[in-house]
């Protein structure tokens, strides 16, 4: 085989195959048969095998994927991949439009309306036009490197086309990997024939496919991808989102054709109404619609809250309802002892998933709706929302169906169940209940608490079943039981070492994370931060009296009493002693001396909806300015910042004669200079 001929032929084949891939995967307009395409690929493979040094990284043969990945490396996202705030009604969309226009000072604004593909978000990086890295969204700040798996997706170009638009030296684009309904059906038919478990829905199938360790298995999932964002588009001379989508197409990315440029909110609502009726006609699943401010300069001015862009919103379709049968009622014990009833259902497909269980909330809910085993019921589900039984179909009730009564003893440990007067919840009275311990450990390890990576439900249950842990503090002694861990099902040396490293990394977590991780009743993330900031150490919190706790602005008597009760418990003392012995951080960050700034010594209450900040953001700003952000109005309140739809707090401030500032007045007075 002549080398000089191969040097000419390989680039020709790459360009020809790339052209036909684009026509097939992106345009859906193939010009040649599958057999003819396979012949071109086979010729290219043979030439590359004969002359390995001529194989290019953007060769279509590289879509087959590289070697099996032992683990997925972490990839930081810059800027973060934010999630979107949700709208569920016309009123929500009109409110979004109002906030946008107010934030822009009444400027004209147009919106790009797009489909919200129900898949897995990805970020792709190109260097000099060559695809070099792809990552999942992860938590928005950090994702997983799935480059080799993304190479197997035919609609993702390995090299960008610069024919219609110049290709920048460095480019980051974002989009969604998905699976079509037809591919899901075909894969499930093959799985059923082999007697294997079926894939539940296209989204889960796509997510699972993209996280396969072997890229060849990813390729078997026949995934696809739509791209919808150019990061730092303004730096590339792109002025608006609509033009960014066109630029993506020019580079030969696959961009969803179902989009609309609207110049008024009424146009947006018309487009939304149209897709509400047509969404089931699509060959893939969507879980809503996305509305974005078109002008990129306006997007930049509107900015972000701590979680969402202010210039975009996701419209969620109304919850789907289906009829099914209650085959049983089961109970689940939570970390604080609350026992929650659930309806065991005859399987029914709702919102793209098979639903076998729905929450019944509490005893009163069951009694009010008179839900009985054997009843035909209407079950509602929307997106990731937990399914719930909304009503009984009385005319279909079996004649022998009996009213359901709450049991007197805990299903997990047999202890007495009690219901405190004035509360809807029924609780297990046994602090040593294994179900409570299981849930408490899961909460301790969860992302917003200690954030122990790799410690999921199955592993926690296995650790408890094998007697390796009894409580959360025992996690920090698992390094002493490494051999026993390795013997657990699905746990090899690599997995065990990763788990132990993840646990060890949390010893120096901030104090507020540990406080939240303890699972104190009524203490959420905000209250945990208040406690950490006020006391500065776990020891100080333990010694605090009820009056001191109640006096903390924003904490309130209910939380204060719960905190006091928690630290009065001998079992809590035992847990904290074990955590201290394990070297878990019990001290907060040292604060600067007396608060300085324009709000030094002031207590500020925020009420209503603000244009510039979320509630969390303005409370953090108040603290940065030296003040305290409180959750309720009292005579100690210095002033109130009142936004749109301010309620009882505003009324109380007026009754007490406490100054009330608008958002603009607050900015002028405390943020100027």
Curated annotation (Swiss-Prot):
Belongs to the NAD-dependent DNA ligase family. LigA subfamily. Residues 54-73 are annotated as: Disordered. PANTHER family: CHROMOSOME TRANSMISSION FIDELITY FACTOR 18, DNA LIGASE. NCBIfam families: dnlj, PRK07956.1. Zn(2+) binds at residues 410, 413, 428, 433. One of its GO terms (biological process) is DNA replication. Its cofactor is Mg(2+); Mn(2+). The gene is ligA. Keywords: DNA damage, DNA repair, DNA replication, Ligase, Magnesium, Manganese, Metal-binding, NAD, Zinc. The active site is at 116 (n6-amp-lysine intermediate). This is DNA ligase. HAMAP family: DNA_ligase_A. Residues 594-673 form the BRCT domain. It catalyses: NAD(+) + (deoxyribonucleotide)n-3'-hydroxyl + 5'-phospho-(deoxyribonucleotide)m = (deoxyribonucleotide)n+m + AMP + beta-nicotinamide D-nucleotide.
């Amino acid at each position: 085989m002549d080398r000089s001929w191969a040097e000419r032929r390989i680039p020709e084949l790459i360009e020809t195959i790339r052209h036909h891939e684009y026509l097939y995967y992106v345009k859906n307009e193939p010009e040649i048969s599958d057999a003819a395409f396979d012949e071109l690929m086979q010729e290219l493979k043979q030439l590359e095998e004969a002359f390995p040094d001529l194989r290019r990284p953007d060769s279509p043969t590289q879509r087959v994927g590289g070697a099996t990945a032992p683990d997925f490396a972490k990839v930081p996202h810059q800027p973060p991949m934010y999630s979107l705030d949700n709208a569920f009604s016309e009123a929500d969309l009109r409110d979004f439009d109002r906030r946008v226009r107010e934030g822009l000072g009444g400027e004209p604004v147009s919106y790009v309306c797009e489909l919200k593909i129900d898949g897995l978000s990805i970020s792709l990086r190109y260097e000099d036009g060559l695809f070099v890295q792809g990552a999942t969204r992860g938590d928005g700040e950090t994702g997983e490197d799935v480059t080799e798996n993304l190479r197997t997706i035919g609609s993702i170009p390995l090299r960008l086309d610069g024919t219609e638009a110049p290709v920048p030296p460095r480019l980051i684009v974002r989009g969604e990997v998905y699976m079509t309904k037809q591919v899901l059906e075909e894969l499930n038919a093959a799985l059923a024939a082999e007697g294997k478990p079926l894939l539940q829905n296209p989204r889960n199938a796509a997510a699972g496919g993209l996280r396969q360790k072997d890229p060849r298995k990813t390729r078997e999932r026949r995934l696809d991808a739509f791209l919808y964002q150019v990061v730092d588009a303004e730096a590339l001379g792109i002025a608006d989102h609509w033009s960014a989508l066109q630029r993506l197409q020019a580079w030969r990315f696959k961009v969803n054709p179902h989009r609309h440029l609207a110049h008024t909110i009424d146009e947006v609502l018309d487009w939304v109404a149209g897709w509400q009726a047509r969404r089931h006609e699509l060959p893939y699943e969507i879980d809503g619609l996305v509305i974005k401010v078109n002008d990129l300069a306006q997007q930049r001015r509107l900015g972000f809250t701590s979680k969402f862009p202010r210039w975009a919103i996701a419209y969620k379709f109304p919850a789907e309802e289906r009829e099914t049968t209650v085959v049983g009622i089961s109970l689940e014990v939570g970390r604080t002892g609350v026992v929650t009833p659930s309806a065991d259902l005859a399987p029914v497909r709702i919102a793209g998933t098979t639903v076998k269980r729905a929450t019944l909330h509490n005893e009163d809910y069951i009694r009010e709706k008179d839900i009985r085993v054997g009843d035909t019921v209407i079950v509602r589900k929307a997106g990731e929302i937990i399914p719930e039984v909304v009503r009984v179909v009385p005319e279909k009730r079996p004649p022998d169906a009996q009213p359901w009564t709450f049991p007197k003893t805990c299903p997990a440990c047999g202890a007495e169940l009690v219901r405190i007067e004035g509360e809807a919840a029924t609780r297990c009275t046994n602090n040593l209940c294994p179900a409570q311990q299981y849930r408490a450990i899961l909460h301790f390890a969860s992302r917003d608490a200690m954030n122990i990576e790799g410690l999921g439900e199955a592993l926690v249950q296995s650790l408890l079943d094998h007697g390796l842990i009894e409580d959360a503090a025992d996690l920090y002694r698992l390094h002493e039981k490494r051999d026993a861990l390795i013997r657990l099902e699905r746990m090899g040396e690599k997995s065990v070492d990763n788990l132990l490293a993840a646990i060890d990394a949390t010893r120096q977590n901030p104090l507020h994370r540990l406080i939240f991780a303890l699972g104190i009743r009524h203490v959420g993330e905000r209250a945990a931060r208040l406690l950490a900031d006020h006391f500065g150490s776990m020891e100080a919190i333990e010694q605090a009296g009820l009056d001191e706790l109640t006096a903390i602005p924003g904490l309130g008597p209910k939380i204060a009493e719960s905190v006091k009760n928690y630290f009065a418990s001998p079992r809590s003392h035992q847990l904290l002693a074990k955590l201290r012995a394990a070297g878990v951080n019990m001290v907060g960050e040292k604060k600067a001396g007396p608060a300085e700034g324009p709000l030094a010594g002031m207590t500020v209450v925020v009420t209503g909806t603000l244009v510039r900040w979320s509630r969390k953001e303005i409370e953090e700003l108040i603290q940065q300015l030296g003040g305290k952000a409180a959750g309720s109005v009292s005579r100690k309140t210095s002033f109130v910042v009142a936004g749109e739809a301010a309620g009882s707090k505003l009324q109380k401030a007026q009754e007490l004669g406490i100054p009330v500032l608008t958002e603009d007045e607050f900015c002028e007075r405390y943020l100027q200079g």
